[in-house]
Amino acid sequence: MSHPLIARAADREVRQAAAFRDAAAAMTGESLRADFEIEQQNAPRLADSGRAYLVKRSGKPASERRKTRDLEHLGSALLRYCREKGESLALPEESGTLELLDYQVRVKGARADDPATRGIGRIDLLGLIDGQRLAVIRMRFVEPGARRCGVGDTPLHVLLDGLAHTAIASACRENIAREVAERFGREVSPDPPVLIFLASPRYWELCRKRSAQKGASWIKELTRLAGEIETETHIPIQYLALRLQGDPGWSYDEQGPLLEGKPLLSDAWEPGADRVKPKPRARARSVAPVEEIVEADLSRPARVYAFSEQYLAGDRISHPVLGEGVVQGLAGDGKIRVRFDESEKVLVHERVASA
């Protein structure tokens, strides 16, 4: 298989909200490293066809929103904001900066339906960490008022797809670095690229709502995979949230998409979100006491019921209305329980007869 990570990303269990956690649990950094290396070996080489990764765009810019092109328009707006402000995006916890280079970066020269490269798309955003290390950014956007994510668009699917595109960028790093140096005057470090999974807060919220304990189990697995993948491939993985101002967060002018305010990057989830709470122990079901039926003591003679008489458990009595019965025991002061056929009645005894 030429592109095993692309194939994994398209797997049915990977794309199912109810199944992707188990699919992630079955994966290891070692197995994904093998797939990553195959992706590198079979990576399309855009430079071989004489085409550039970083291109100067021409034509009329977008003037209105199309939801099917939200990622493209958001990427354009982010890049425009950073260039007009002359600044990079701050990574969470002052861990560095992210300088954006281009959006919707093409990585293959073949047709979209070419079997050899089917499933390989464009890189949503390409950037530099601290002005040096290449960053491949895979994005997902869900507007603040959305009630659901896209069908089949699970975090594991995006992670595997992003890892495949990072493998391509890693294989073509020298050509990309040369273009970055020529166009931006930046020297790209020889370190492997960083993969950033960047999504709107609502995307993360909806993904977590679909799972128990706010997604703790799948967050745990994706966190584990990120650590194992970095150990095996030296590709760091960051899960981040992109906070925008407004809804959806950008508008349009004559130059195209324009952010409505400063974008902020934060961690995708809070510390401890991957802590899975143990299931509470099942409570022992209370068992209803088994009713014990006192059998008649045949050694005692049957007696006609009279409220002034004293009766003990096992006594046989004959009631003028209820018929034959067996005393089961006391039912309180001056009362007895008597079983007649399948029913039980409470009668009085030891009562003093009135003069």
Which sequence ranges carry the predicted segments?
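Residue-level detector of beta-strand face positions
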Residues: 124-126, 316, 337
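Mixed-charge, Lys/Arg-rich low-complexity intrinsically disordered regions
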Residues: 279-313
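Basic/aromatic-rich interaction segments and small domains that mediate binding to polyanionic partners
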Residues: 304, 313, 320-355
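A short linear-motif detector with a strong N-terminal bias
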Residues: 174-176, 218-219, 295-298, 304-307, ...
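Charged, terminal alpha-helix-loop-beta segments
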Residues: 1-288, 312, 329-330
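A general marker of short, structured functional hotspots
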Residues: 32, 49, 99, 161, ...
